[in-house]
Amino acid sequence: MKFNRLLKLNEQITTHAIIENIQQKGRNYILTLKSIHLDSNSKETGTSEWSLFIRAEDSKLEKSNQQKDPKPKPKPKAPSEASTKQIIFSQDFHVPDGVTYKYAEASGDRNKIHIDPEYAKKAGLDGVIVHGLCTMAMAIEQITDNHLGGFPGTIKEVGLRFSSPVWPTDDLTVQGWKAEDEENSLLFEVNRSGGDTKVIKSGRLKFENEQHIGF
């Protein structure tokens, strides 16, 4: 996500998305989208790029005609990226109960896995899960308020990967360290507190300058 400016309260934003690529990965697909976000004067407020993993459902005929693949050997667990770096900030935060309903109204994303417990269970989940962008927003808020001097306008670009579902009432921890390959950039990840489950990984935040940086 790249940000040209801060958005105003109650501002009307229109998003146009185009498909840039569809890549097959096994029986599944990776869909790459690029979105442009425009204000009411058709001026660009920012852009975003998305990689979506789409699971393909195998037909009964295909399953009956193919042999099962041998069970793959488990890969050794890679160390947390943060564990190999010098942590310069670590901040805990709580995911409020009911946040999915508020975020659904604010964002317009009313996918039932976020607001309908029974539907979420039919989809194989234990209950409603938090929107990925909602989790991202809460994590970036912690970074901004506690480590960027409370100046969101200094953020110019954010990239990350959603790696595990987040549930209402979860306690999370965001950790960050300076990027060695780029100035005015920091890396971060978000873990479920008290465990080693990463819910956001490969996070990178680029900011305008270090004038207001609090570390």
Which residue stretches match the model-derived regions?
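HotDog/MaoC-like acyl-thioester-processing domains
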Residues: F3-Q91, V166-T169, T173-F215
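Catalytic-pocket segment enriched in acidic/His residues
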Residues: E118-N184, V190-T197, H212-F215
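Hot-dog-fold acyl-thioester-processing enzymes
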Residues: S59-E62, P79-P152
